[in-house]
Amino acid sequence: MHGSVSGYLLVNAEVDSMGGVIDSGGGIGVKTSPRRTAIEKAQAELRQEYDVREERRRELEFLEKGGNPLDFKFGIATSHSVQSTSLTDQQAEHFVNSEVKDSFALTASPHGDSVESSGRPGVPTISEPNTADNLLLFDSENKSVEGERNLRHPNRQNRTSESERSSKAHTNQNTKETEDSAIFRPYARRNRSKISRDPARSSSTDLVQNRGGLATSISIRRGSVEGKGCIPEAANQKDMHTTSVSCPVFANSNGNIVPKNRVSSNSLNTKVDGEPVVRESTAGSKTSLLKDEADISYSKSSAYLPVGESGLAGEKAQLVSTGGSPKAATIAGQKNSSTQLNGLRDSTVEEESLTNRGATGTNGLESESSHANNVEVNVDNERDLYKVDKLDSDEISMQKTLRVEGLLDQTVGEMTKTKIEDETGQSTTIISECIPECEMQMKSVKIENQSHRSTAEMQTKEKSSETEKRLQDGLVVLENDSKVGSILSENPSSTLCSGIPQASVDTSSCTVGNSLLSGTDIEALKHQPSSDAVMLDTVKEDAILEEARIIQAKKKRIAELSCGTAPVEVREKSQWDFVLEEMAWLANDFAQERLWKMTAATQICHRVALTCQLRFEERNQHRKLKKIASVLSYAILQFWSSVEAEVPGELEETSLGIVKETCQESNCLNGIRCLAAGVKEYASRFLKYNNSSISYHSAALSTPDNMCDPEILDISMVDQLTEASLFYSVPSGAMEVYLKSIESHLTRCEKSGSSMQEEVDTSAYDTAGDIGYNVTAFDEDEGETSTYYLPGAFESSRSFNISHKKRKNLMKSHSARSYDLGDDLPYVNNTGGSNSSSLIVKRPDSNINAGSVPTRRVRTASRHRVVSPFGCATTGNLPVPSKTDASSGDTSSFQDEYSSLHGGSAVQKGTEVESSVNFEKLLPYDMAETSGKPKKKKKTHQGSAYDQTWHLNPSVHVEQKDHWKKRPENNFDMNGLYGPHSAKKQKTTKQLVENNFDMAIPHTGSIPSPAASQMSNMSNPNKSIKFIGGRDRGRKIKGLKISPGQHGSGNPWSLFEDQALVVLVHDMGPNWELISDAMNSTLKIKYIYRNPTECKDRHKILMDKTAGDGADSAEDSGNSQSYPSTLPGIPKGSARQLFQRLQGPMEEDTLKSHFEKICLIGKKLHYRKTQNDGRDPKQIVPVHNSQVMALSQVFPNNLNGGVLTPLDVCDASTSGQDVFSLENPGLPMLNQGTPVLPTSGAHPSTPGSSGVVLSNNLPTTSGLQSASVRDGRFNVPRGSLPLDEQHRLQQFNQTLSGRNLQQPSLSTPAAVSGSDRGHRMVPGGNAMGVSGMNRNTPMSRPGFQGMASAAMPNTGNMHTSGMVGIPNTGNIHSGGGASQGNSMIRPREAVQHMMRMQAAQGNSPGIPAFSNLSSGFTNQTTPVQAYPGHLSQQHQMSPQSHVLGNSHHPHLQSPSQATGAQQEAFAIRQRQIHQRYLQQQQQQFPASGSMMPHVQQPQGSSVSSSSQNSPQTQPPVSPQPLSMPPVSPSPNINAMAQQKPQKSQLALHGLGRSPQSGTSGVNNQAGKQRQRQLQQSARQHPHQRQPTQGQQLNKQLKGMGRGNMIHQNITVDQSHLNGLTMPQGNQATEKGEIAVSVRPDQQSSVGTTTSTDLQSKPFVSPLSSNHSQQLPKSFPGALSPSPQQQMQLHSDNSIQGQSSPATPCNILSTSSLSIAPAVAPSNHQHLLIHQKQRNQVQSTAQRVVQHNHLGNSELSKKSQAECMPRVPQSVTNTTQTASMGTTKGMPQASNDLKNIKAVGSTAVPALEPPSCVASVQSTASKVVNNSNTDSAGNDPVSTPNQGLAQKHGIKGVTQRQQQSLPSEEKRPKLPEKPTVQNQKHLASEEQPHLEEAQELSSSKPPDTKVE
């Protein structure tokens, strides 16, 4: 009861709802009519009477049964105990032991095992409803409770017991429910399964459960009421309980201790307990007998009986049931348990349930306990009994009568109830009571079977156990079981009478059914006629009486419990009761575990033994086999030696015919000898032929025509093969024949035509020269020349001629094709499987278009095929294929077979045997990637190639074909190096890869084809790859390179195109289609298409000038022309590499112009949609922030699959592909550039930033890389039209945002590289300023370019690195911070940013922190190189980036790189992946991205630094460029950094911070904290984490001051990027918290959430601070809305108090970020003035923020407003208020104390934009470090920290808090709580750090005041 207090309440409710009807399933009646009140009163009275009567009956029964009077008393007490223990059954057990030990085996540990109650025998069961009740109570608890109670109070308790039992059944049901729900759930397994687990114990527990039979009966009733849903559990447990339930005869439902039941139960109990215990039944012997039966039956179904029979009604029903119990019970049990119970539930069952509830109310604790305990078991198994009980509607009256009359009737009633209960759920229902009427009605005997029906499986178990027990006890269990089925059908009405069964509950012992049935039946029959006649009336009466009885029983039981049972029950429910139960469980568990362990040990030992035996046997077997093998080998050797000895003689003596004759003779002589002779003859013939093969070969040589056909091998070979001799070795003359055939073929080829020869010379011979393989050179001669490689040996010259002719045709059609064939064949053997991969790689290398254009792809595949044999370094790779691959062969293959995989087919044909592998691989690639034109020629080649190669392994070819088809999708190149890229941006990746490969690896010449392709790809990811691809593919790539500057075939050839053409022809030979393909791939950006004819003509013109045109003839033959295509003194493969390096500037110019065009177009399209007001629609179109976040999390690698808009998806995909492919190529710059472009492109907001990064990055990287990047970038858009076009659109979108950036990017020096990279990314390096300035492009560019150029190298480089860092979060910061809107937004801000960047440089710690963040993003500062898309390169580039752009950044990056390099590599990759998603998301909100760049520029630096974690973030904040890149790159970088780099960022951050003086400790600790925080958040929510950083960044940006809006924009991107988002958070500091809060949404939705926050000053309203969708709006708003508007929007969105920061937004309006200025002044003042105060303010701000978010917000507004004017003048002004206000106000936005602090800190840096910008900047860099480490938002606060170490520390803390807050704010959308926790954690952690920072900053305040 106590354990199931809720159950008790439920019981009361049930009693209330008992109305007249009990909900069998619900257990809660709907009626609470006045009649019920009257009924309850009457029931209470009746219950008392009935209890007394029943107790007397039970006594009589007990005595009649021969039970001890003492036992009977104990029984009563036990009844009470059982009832009270009903839930736990331990009481029942205890009482049973003391009172009815004979009856109850319950006391034995079995019960405890089954049920917890056995664990502590004396304890009232009610306390243990969970444990014992669940197990025991199912069967015994209700019985026990009621039975024991009845025993204690034979008269009063019988009735009460019954009602209690029913109520307990309900209680158990409710308790069970409660148990299931809360407390009991832990015990559910033990409670339910213990009996089930303990079938054996079930027997021993039987008595206990029998004792609990009453309880079980009650439980059964409860089960029926509770619901059949419980039946399975209950049934299982019941089955387990079955035996035990049958035992508790004394614990009759009626409450009789089973005096009579004991008699019947004695058999059961005696058998169970081992002593003849008659169930004590106070009511009388008959009742007790019935009860015994009922209990026994209930032992199975006792759990259900109580449920089925609610208190009074249950008893009556039992009594009535006793009359008609057998039938009724059986019927109910079998079907009515389900059907009748349900159907009759409303009337009888519900009544019973109500009665039970009433009884529960009356019985109170006991009933409830028993209910709770019995519920589970009873519900399942006893429901049937319950129904049976109900079956006898007259049972109630009968029970009354019986109770009044005597124990027998009561027993009958109990039996009926038992039967009903059995019907309800238990198969062991005592339905087998002998009462004829009962049998007629219910055939209750069958109720036992009902268990089977109701709980088919469990009841079956129950039945078996119960039957067993009953057989043991001599009970009628079997009979009952058999009857169950019939009873249901017979007695639906009886089931309705369940209300009566209370008495029957105790009679639930099915065992009594048969044995006691006769006796019980007599009285039951006596009452049964009346019950049958008065059945309906009885039902009503029963309901009323049951309710009254329940009330009485409750009162009595309460009294009893209070007297003895109740206290026990209460105590039972105490903690210690549960402890005891748990101990019992544990004991059982330990015992079980011991058994399990023993068993397991036994099994293990057995297995060990078996294993040892098996090993031993295996060894023996091996020995035997070895012996056999040795014998066989010896015999074979002997045989061959004997044959060899004989052969010479045979050869001399006779010919083959003679040998045959000899064999025949020997055969004639002896059969065996004949066989042996035959074998020997065969062997001798083989040897003879083998020896004579030379002559055959010579013959073959003499007839080379025979060798033409692979089918027609040398005659000698054919003879050998045709002979019986299957054993043959390669004839000794085979090589000679092969050489001769090749030579003849070469001669023929030379004779065949000058054009063909020229081709061969240029491509094949050059390659051959490189490779030094004549055959290969010959193969190169023609596309099919390679066919001669392998086939040549067998084909002889004729085949060669045929092949040559075919090749000639093919070469004419596909010069590259024939070349490819030659290449492939040589490599077939060497490269094998890798060949395909290499080829694939190569094909993509030479033609990026391959990815986009199937035909080119095919060519690429063909080239890949060639590459495969040659690797990327065709020349260097495999000697044979190398020549062909390098020059015409590969080119031809690339051109012709690019679609048709000509190389594969031609090579296959030429290769014959060897080429089969190549051909397979190549051909599949051809099939997969071949498309259009090449296929036709390929078909031609296939004719011959297939002739020779197909015959070898057509299936393999098909497989390869399929494989390649699949492969291009997954991994375009077999190597898988570019596979992913091939799939997404096959064209770009492939071209880049191939070009790089060809350029780099051909030079290497040492790299195998697969390795070469990979290496070349790695070395020249962008331009190199493109050129390499061009070189590999000969003219094609050359064409690509040559015409990057020109558009269309009609356009004049630009110098670049000419150079590229020459280079490609030099490298690839005059394979014009291949060269055209390569050229087009290279020039894809320009959308220039040079067809093969144009390339040939142009090359002829060029060569006429330089070397004469063999191009014409070469073109004619397709490959054969020996063209002065080779550049003197330049190796074949290296020309393209060289050209790539040289072409960089040209390519950059082309990229720049082309990208600017793209930007213009993109702006119109994408900018309208996304960045401008279209941004709102764009954001609306994109899914929710959560969706974006989810997408980024779910599709970190597959941005395309997101819910993002198609363009966003494409952009993300493209950027991801570019990054990845570039990454794979290993060209740090190229890859970075290319990835950056796509990455940037992925995010409209990112583009500018990425553009900036690109620009810086590319400049950082070599021009060649830029060109490669551009080529790859453009190729991807151009190459794969669907995918690439999407990419292009994305790029345009990026360009739109990046266009502004791009133009500046283009204009700025970095822009050039940016354009190289920026093509995809948007603007190049300029993107820093431009990106941040996207909206403010005009402003941003001049400032940014000036800044970006100057600052970009410095800050700009930081920005560049920031941009480059797009892959690397840090990179973005670097670029973003420096060039971000500060310069753009405010020229002075740009200067200040520069100053700050310098200050940051001065504050190397801050920058290092940034750098570390960069490290996290690895090349945030140096991301230019990092950007190239190589994460590893990012590490490499990071230092470069520093060197390139940042004098201060260099050291920053150095430490950060050093510390974060490794982290960076991993983190960058993660970030890049994440960035792709972020970019996608940001692109969804391109306006946000673009807007963000503008608004973010000031903020961008902050964002940048935030992105890079404080050090670099701050410097970027100072320089305008910094703020910008964060916008565009920040999404990428932050995405990357947030995802994984965040960890590295944090770690790097800590490292970077450590360099910072004063803040280093704080930074490190904060960084660690933040790292953990971010890591956690990142793990939980990659995007959320990014948003957290973004928010922090917003705060930082706000704190940074100037450019807050811009930074916010950037931060919006950064919101995804984490780091960048932090600066935005800072900008949002005043209202940055809003930004932060917005950031979370932005984070998921767009990288620009924070940036929107910052913009929120400009963009805040659109941002809505908290909604990423708002963010897009805010971005457009930021551009369009005035700073005030933004400020207002921001404050509205995020914080009212932030509105004052919005006011600063006005100030910022000059800088495009009013908020930043306002924040900056306040922050700066706070920073300068309040280093110490900041600590105080932070702590106070935390407190105040927590308590006074709004007030603080206002304060921050005021202070910010105040500080706004001051900021320019005195950073040291008492912006304490502002900072505090900001800090406090911030928290409103951030909704976090810590965030508020961060805001406050952030505000300080923000307050120092004009005059103190430099100091603030330097401080900001440090602060940003802290922020990043701590939390994105906090870093900006500590931006001034360099000068103010204190401030920095405080700001770091604050920023950290802010970071936490942004996370929290963001997380509210996702996981808000974790962020809050982190914030709190950070707050606690950061306090000491803040103090340290204070000390440090106080020690170096001058630094804070940078110029």
UniProtKB/Swiss-Prot annotation:
Its main location: nucleus. CDD domains: SANT. Residues 140-151, 1863-1872, 1882-1892 have a biased composition (Basic and acidic residues). GO terms for biological process: chromatin organization; regulation of flower development; regulation of photoperiodism, flowering; regulation of timing of transition from vegetative to reproductive phase. Gene3D superfamilies: Homeodomain-like (1.10.10.60). Residues 563-641 form the HSA domain. Residues 261-270, 333-342, 355-372, 884-898, 942-952, 1116-1125, 1242-1266, 1296-1310, 1431-1444, 1453-1462, 1532-1545, 1554-1568, 1585-1594, 1640-1655, 1662-1672, 1681-1703, 1769-1782, 1824-1844 have a biased composition (Polar residues). Residues 1049-1105 form the SANT domain. InterPro entries: EAF1A/B, Homeodomain-like_sf, HSA_dom, SANT/Myb. Residues 856-866 have a biased composition (Basic residues). Component of the NuA4 histone acetyltransferase complex. Interacts with ARP4 and SWC4, and (via HSA domain) with TAF14 and TAF14B. Component of the NuA4 histone acetyltransferase complex which is involved in transcriptional activation of selected genes principally by acetylation of nucleosomal histone H4 and H2A. This is Chromatin modification-related protein EAF1 B.
